[in-house]
Amino acid sequence: MKSRLNIPPIPAVIIAILSVQCGAAIAKGLFPEIGAAATASLRIGLSAIILSIAFRPNLLKLNAKQWKYVILYGFSLGLMNMVFYLSISRIPIGLGVTLEFIGPLVLAIFSSKRVIDFIWVTLSIVGIALIAPWSSNGLNISGVLLALLAGVFWAAYIILGGRISKIMKGGEAVAVGMLFATIIILPFGIFSGGLSGLNPRLLVLGAALALLSSAIPFTLEIGALKQLPARTFSILMSLEPAMASLAAFIFLKEHLSLTECAAVGCVVIASAGSSFTARGNKH
């Protein structure tokens, strides 16, 4: 779809990144009240409703192949978000995003297998080592492992998203995927007990979270992808760990040490470098 605001593509991507990270900051603010699993369930569930209204997918027209991939796509989407929220309930958002980013970064690099790409692998390993739980910074090991697991689900989401984009329209795929994401993570939200305490204020915050983390960035990114080369888009997305750290600092007063900032920088440079030196089509 074309953005009615006619935002130029590069600012649109930057706004989308900021929107997602502001959403993550709002989400973390809800953790003390309803918990990470319930927050993820609330966000994904409301996102599914919003996107279903916006794109009105016709479930009766899906064939067996579409059902197969959209279910797997939805499960990876839901688990990626829930595991990430569980991670940032234990470690700072900026570090959680940095560690999660390793998943798609490694996927992109090893899909190429060129010598120069191993430089980016090494740099990303340095970034992980700088914030590893066995270092002197005392990070929560379960938070680190959950962030890395979220990265695995993110890589799966990218692979499945690429396949499903060839057999379904983008908006329809995401809307149906969100429905299955809700199915897979809603039980965790219910069993955690967090959803039992929902009230109008929390529902409004949940709706804002769904808009900031799903509807707004999805719309902006779809419009930008039609105008930007894939490489440029990937380089811009490399800013995400830094943007996450900035949003967490502004909204949650989460401060990173110099070592942790260096770790974020290593992953940002590795991701940008991988995108810049990538071979591939511009469309």
Model-inferred region functions:
Residues 26, 33-79, 107, 123, ...:
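Transmembrane alpha-helices of multi-pass small-molecule transport proteins
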Residues 42, 97-99, 160-182, 214-250:
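Helix-helix packing/entry segments at the starts of transmembrane helices
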Residues 30, 39, 43, 87, ...:
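Hydrophobic/aromatic residues within transmembrane alpha-helices
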Residues 1-38, 72-75, 79-83, 126, ...:
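Glycine-/small-residue-enriched transmembrane alpha-helix faces in small-molecule transporters
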Residues 2-3, 44, 202, 238-283:
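C-terminal-most transmembrane helix of multi-pass membrane proteins
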Residues 64, 97-100, 110-131, 137-144, ...:
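Loop-to-transmembrane alpha-helix entry segments
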Residues 38-41, 45, 85-115, 150, ...:
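Specific alpha-helical transmembrane segments that line the substrate/conduction pathway
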Residues 1-18, 48-72, 113-119, 136-142, ...:
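Membrane-interface interhelical linkers
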